[in-house]
């Protein structure tokens, strides 16, 4: 266990003017308070806050943060009080220690709710001071390092919580090394067999390639030294969780992975980053499509680096990251590292510096949005979503900021503002221009929702939205509209039925008959009659028990099969009732489900089109799973486009021609759909055969292949394939990208 003077010395190495008195007092106080307490492992409990403090010294944090780490469990697990800590260490440290205290005594309905409330308190505390986050992550990291002594069920619960919340939170805040270690430790307990298998394979691969990695490292170092660039080069290997996740999400085998090894180049200045990049690209061939400049355009979590991929000496792909040493420290420690470079020579606290970073700004915005909810379990699920997905930020005409997931549409925006606005939405202006409701919103868009009181959200909207709130509201509104429709039809049916029976009718007259009909209210009766579940004669008899039905029934005068009544709904049971097409009460829209294909022609699996108009796919095609839209072509019917088609820009100013359509695929569908893939491959023997083998292994048919451009190192080609759906197409593209022969592969739209 680290001694008192050793802790002070660790901090002095990076902060010579350390407040030794504060560290010594916190060390002694925490040690005395925890006393003889033991951890599950049998170690003294004080060893835990001491290890948490040690993790934070590795991140070069100030003595106040180290003191908070030493004290973080005292209020929860000892006789220490907030008042006592305030008196000894000041109210600021007392407040942060209390912010780290778990909620064990809440009267909540489930373990999940307790977890959610703990997380809510943590996030709200983080929003006030980033040091709460740093201590909590270090606390979780040490607990994960010692998780093996716990019961199996507790290990699994803590590991899953770490993978779901703490690892992505560390990543969002730019603390990549901590994120990776948390993921690896969690992976080990969540799926031990997979962890062991991947770890063993990586060890074998490292041993096999050790000499090659050393050669590349030496070659790079010599090139930089020869050109006067002071650089350090080190090889790196993907972590087991990263490898396993890629295999799972992209359907790849271990052998198909081609970027397990990479190199990190660290230099002194930004200018040296670009000089090093130029030397690398003039020495080796660059792989097209694999260059990313995060220095000129940093990531949301402040990560900055240049990424490029080259063809190495043995014609293998090698990924390189080029960054300054300052960028490397920020990539490793995230928000914590900003104090090292922005606070040198200053009396400011690191947490004040950290609140200026992009990553911390994101966290505050997320917390503001999430803290509005009251349901703790819903809060937990929403938090997980927010941690894992990118966001777009749009504005109302009055300047209110609305945060939405990437891929959101104006419909999502409308429901995010208010459910009533979503339900009454009929159109949208995006940046002053009327745009289709399926338009994907971008950062900074100003969205003005056009409303109508007569609007009812169509069920087809479900396929256009990206948020759970919008989807749930659409379902609720759709159910309500359908019930209202059936209720109106039931009202008309009963009016006619009571008229034929010679009995007076009103809604109030139905109330005495509710017990006999076993219905809860009058609206339930009307809807049941409208749906055909309840014969109108049963209702008349329930209200007037002495009534004798003398009408002609369907048994002696059957209706024609498939006849429709009002609202295009099948006639109610017990009555022959038909309204002619186009007559009073006829449906305003054609039921797409009733469309019957003409003999000899295959019906397109599309819903939402008029059966009287011809429908065709655009030249670039669309596959099931694509978000699609129909464009009305005067005199030529409807053309179906994938929503990402560049050709749709020609119709931006003609929203009246856009038609909401969706796929209508059933399990018996055996149709394949054409798609086009652009591939850039290494120009070497066997490359084409490997590409064809990937298509064949995935049960895809290549029906055309054309070479676009050929160079000594690379060749570009267009491949036309036939696939079942978007998932099938994406799997093929993913495996092409992972092939050692392929430098890039992407779908062609238009």
Curated annotation (Swiss-Prot):
Stored InterPro entries: ACT-like_dom_sf, ACT_dom, Beta-grasp_dom_sf, HD/PDEase_dom, HD_domain, NT_sf, RelA/Spo_fam, RelA/SpoT_AH_RIS
Highest rank taxon of the organism: Bacteria
SMART domains: HDc, RelA_SpoT
Gene3D superfamilies, per database record: 3.10.20.30, 3.30.70.260, Beta Polymerase, domain 2 (3.30.460.10), Hypothetical protein af1432 (1.10.3210.10)
One GO process term, biological-process aspect: response to starvation
Main function: Functions as a (p)ppGpp synthase. In eubacteria ppGpp (guanosine 3'-diphosphate 5'-diphosphate) is a mediator of the stringent response that coordinates a variety of cellular activities in response to changes in nutritional abundance. Plays a role in adaptation of Brucella to its intracellular host environment.
Keywords on record: ATP-binding, GTP-binding, Kinase, Nucleotide-binding, Transferase
Domain (HD): residue spans on this chain: 45-144
Catalysis: reaction(s): GTP + ATP = guanosine 3'-diphosphate 5'-triphosphate + AMP
The species this protein was found in: Brucella ovis (strain ATCC 25840 / 63/290 / NCTC 10512)
GO molecular function: ATP binding; GTP binding; GTP diphosphokinase activity; guanosine-3',5'-bis(diphosphate) 3'-diphosphatase activity; kinase activity
EC number: 2.7.6.5
Gene (name only): rsh
PANTHER family found in the cross-reference section: BIFUNCTIONAL (P)PPGPP SYNTHASE_HYDROLASE SPOT, GUANOSINE-3',5'-BIS DIPHOSPHATE 3'-PYROPHOSPHOHYDROLASE
Residue segments, region Disordered: 587-613
Domain TGS: 390-451
Protein's name in the database: GTP pyrophosphokinase rsh
Family listed: Belongs to the RelA/SpoT family.
